Every structure is written in structure tokens, then in C-alpha cells.
Amino acid sequence: MFKKLVLAAAFCATASFATWDKFPVLEDHKGETVVGVGYDYEGSSELMLLKPYLGSRFTVAPNLELAVLLPYYVNLSEIFCTRYVNLDNNNGLGNPELMARYQITPFLNVFLDVLVPVNQSYGFYNEWVLSLGAQFSKNFGIVDFGSELGLSVNLETNDDFSAPLRLNFGAEADFKLNIPLTPFVGADALVLMGHVTGKNEAGEKYNDNLTGEFAVYPYVGLKYAITPKLTLQASAKTAVGKSVVIGEDTPFMADLKLKMAI
């Protein structure tokens, strides 16, 4: 049980903050700032986290977009934290994410994301996490379609925890209705490749092959254009898949953000 809880927390963190979105980069010298809050709940482990965050992206040169996202973790589940991964001592700034995207063609871009280890939030244990991949997007009438394929890897290993490679892929459809409201639906998938190593509650080492273990994260949401430069966005996400990835119970994740064009 302990191993599954730590794994589910770590993989949940990987899925929580992906690339900024699945659509083309902004025009040259355009930018966006976002202020939001996320909520994660996983019943069997009593994991409940509130995650305020602040982020900004800017196209510094034609087709080149740079971004940073700063999460802050507020532990709402004292039982889980004191019993398992001790997150009660890690409330505060989470691992910042640095992101870069380059638009190769109007339909294709590549991305590179780096999680910087400033905290032991979510079981990453001070490890750098690198994600890289490509995105394809296209407009189909009233539907803006975006998709992504990427690979995430922990750049360091230690005796306490070592995670396998994670293959990420997903797609989203935004429905343009010529009104201020834009509904969207999507799903992200996570497939593990390799071994996980670590220690259980008794201090005994384990080394398990998790290749092929997977989870799918479907989500729905709504965007409301308050003004041409100000958008309110809300979404809800759940997960289906193997318990080693998502935990014993079906998790629930919600997100509310305000996006401001700059």
C-alpha cells in the first residue's frame, strides 16, 4: 500500500502541470499570465491538496515561446502526510516548471519542460524531471484540435525512490461557438516504461518492473471570455487505470484559473 501511494502521488504530479497547452505558440512578442488554483483528491490515501499557482508565458522571438509556472502546495490531508510521505513538512512552494516551445510549422511544435527540485513535494525527492515531445494542432471549423506526445524522465536516482520513464500523450478539442463561452473536452494518457525502486515502510528495498502500467485522465472544461484579454477557465479531471499509477480509489482533480493576455 505504501509503495502505491507514493507512486500515485508522484505520477499525479507529472500529470498536474503539463505543457502550457496543446495549441500553437503565441504571436511574436505576445504573452499571457495565469493565476489559478487546483484541487487534488484521492480517497483511499486521504490525499487532499490545494495548489494555488502563478504562471506566465511570452514569445521572445518568432515561433519561440518561454514560460514559467510556480505552484504552491497546501496540504489538506494531515493523516496522509504524517503517515506516509510527510508532506506536512513540505507545504509551500512546489517544484517550479520551466517550459519552452518552438513552432516548426503552423501545425507542429516541439516542447521542453523542466521541473526544478526546490521541494520534496509529491515524492519527487529533490529530483530534476525532464519532459520533451511534440504537439500537433489544427482547426476543423468550429473545433480547435490539439494533441501532444511526450516523454518524462527523472534525471537523478537515489535509494529512497527511483521512478520509471513516463510516456505521455493526449488530445483536446475546443468548441468555438461564436459566444463568450468555449466548452472543451480532452484526455491525457500516461504509460510507464521501466522499473521503480525504493524502500517500503519496513525499510526493505523493492525493484518492480512497471512497463505497460497506464492511466487515462479524461477532463472537461469551460472557458469564459470576460474581455478580449481576460478569460476565466474551469475544468474537472478524473482518472482510470492501474492502481499503481492512480491509487486505490478514483481520483478527482479540479482547476480554476484566470488568464490575462499581455
Please annotate each region the language model reported:
Residues D160, P164-R166:
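Aromatic- and glycine-enriched pocket-lining scaffold segments that form the walls
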Residues A18-N154, R166-N168, D174-I262:
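Transmembrane beta-barrel domains of Gram-negative outer membranes and organellar outer membranes
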Residues M1-E27:
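Cleavable N-terminal export/targeting peptides
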